Amino acid sequence: GVLPFVVELLRRGTEVVLVANALPALNDVTADELSSLLERAAETCGGILKSALYGDEGQGLKTPSLYVVSSGNGGPCIDLRRASRELIEASLNVDLVVLEGMGRAVHTNYNAEFVCDSLKLAMIKNARLAERLCQGEMFDCVVRFDAVSTRDDETLTSSAEKP
C-alpha cells in the first residue's frame, strides 16, 4: 500500500492528508476504516507514524501532521467535482496531490490539471486500457508526474490581479 510512501513523506517533515471514500467500493478502504488502520499501525510501529498521527513534542511535532479525510465519493473512481467540504478545505494551499489506483489516477483524472504538482500512480488491470494508454500490457504500472510550471503560476497571478 501507500503507507511506506506516507512514512517517507513524514520523515521529511511533510504534512500528509490521506483521502479515502466515504462509502465502501470494491476492495477500497473507507475513511473510517483508514483511520482505524492508521491507529493500529501507529500503535504497532510507533516512531514517526505515531508522532505524526497524535503529535509528539519530543519529536518536534506539537500538532499532528497526518490526517484522514473523506472524499465524499463512494465509488472506485473519484469525481473531484463532488468532493466533500472536508476534502476541499484540506486541499487548500497543498504543494502536491497524489492520486493512487487505476480508478482515481487513470480512469477519472489522468488528464486532470491541478494548481499544484500532481503524481498519478496506478497498476493497469485492463488489457485494452493498457494498450490504449501506454501501448503496454496488463499489470504494467503508470507513474505520471505533472509539474505546475512557473510560467503558469505567473499567468494565474497576473490574471487574478487584473481588474
Predicted regions and their residues:
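Histidine-anchored nucleotide/phosphate-binding helix
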Residues: 1-18
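Short beta-strand/turn micro-motifs composed of small residues
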Residues: 18-20, 122
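Short beta-alpha junction loops
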Residues: 20-26
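C-terminal functional extensions of proteins
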Residues: 30-32, 38-163
